């Protein structure tokens, strides 16, 4: 109905805005984003609905649809044999949450963008990711983020829409760069069990891929020098 449509449109606009905030949208995309914002304000005024409240309701609707779709995909996977599986370490809220860097560092690694906050020091950090898997190997990275124990986002690896396509080795190398940069500031970094299983294939006892000190220093300098 009209209200539900407005709620979903509000949430999808929020997701597109997050994409634009990462400076990944082209000019037509940004133009549509601005025009759609004006349209949503007008529709909200006509319907007497608050956009922020509508966005939260739209998020719940989208989450329900995705859960139903995942169940259907799982049934089809069982019926048809080998197929991609979508694995989630992060919730939709963790994926769409805004975050800011006090000392931003950024590196392009092929079709992947690595971002991190160099101001973070002496923290326990865990890497979480949402990605697809086929034949028990990482197929496509959707998004990877680094979280402190209190849930703050301090790093991220995301694919570039303008440069589609990456391998599991590309993702592994990007994760190594991110870990090296974070550990340069005496942070302790570990990866989620899902990432250990499908992206790294090996780890030490604390769930962190083994990285020699020399390699860590080299990767940290690389991130700093390429920004």
From Swiss-Prot:
Its main location: host cell. Belongs to the influenza A viruses NS1 family. Residues 202-227 are annotated as: Disordered. Transmembrane segments: none annotated. A motif (Nuclear localization signal) lies at residues 31-35. Upon interferon induction, ISGylated via host HERC5; this results in the impairment of NS1 interaction with RNA targets due to its inability to form homodimers and to interact with host EIF2AK2/PKR. GO terms for biological process: symbiont-mediated suppression of host cytoplasmic pattern recognition receptor signaling pathway via inhibition of RIG-I activity; symbiont-mediated suppression of host gene expression; symbiont-mediated suppression of host mRNA processing; symbiont-mediated suppression of host PKR/eIFalpha signaling; symbiont-mediated suppression of host type I interferon-mediated signaling pathway. Residues 220-227 are annotated as: PABPN1-binding. This is Non-structural protein 1. GO terms for cellular component: host cell cytoplasm; host cell nucleus. Keywords: Eukaryotic host gene expression shutoff by virus, Host cytoplasm, Host gene expression shutoff by virus, Host mRNA suppression by virus, Host nucleus, Host-virus interaction, Inhibition of host innate immune response by virus, Inhibition of host interferon signaling pathway by virus, Inhibition of host PKR by virus, Inhibition of host pre-mRNA processing by virus, Inhibition of host RIG-I by virus, Inhibition of host RLR pathway by virus, Interferon antiviral system evasion, RNA-binding, Ubl conjugation, Viral immunoevasion. One of its GO terms (molecular function) is RNA binding. A motif (Nuclear export signal) lies at residues 134-143. The dsRNA-binding region is required for suppression of RNA silencing. The keyword Ubl conjugation applies. InterPro entries: NS1, NS1A, NS1A_effect_dom-like_sf, uS15_NS1_RNA-bd_sf. It is found in: Host nucleus; Host cytoplasm. Residues 177-212 are annotated as: CPSF4-binding. Homodimer. Interacts with host TRIM25 (via coiled coil); this interaction specifically inhibits TRIM25 multimerization and TRIM25-mediated RIGI CARD ubiquitination. Interacts with human EIF2AK2/PKR, CPSF4, IVNS1ABP and PABPN1. Inhibits post-transcriptional processing of cellular pre-mRNA, by binding and inhibiting two cellular proteins that are required for the 3'-end processing of cellular pre-mRNAs: the 30 kDa cleavage and polyadenylation specificity factor/CPSF4 and the poly(A)-binding protein 2/PABPN1. In turn, unprocessed 3' end pre-mRNAs accumulate in the host nucleus and are no longer exported to the cytoplasm. Cellular protein synthesis is thereby shut off very early after virus infection.
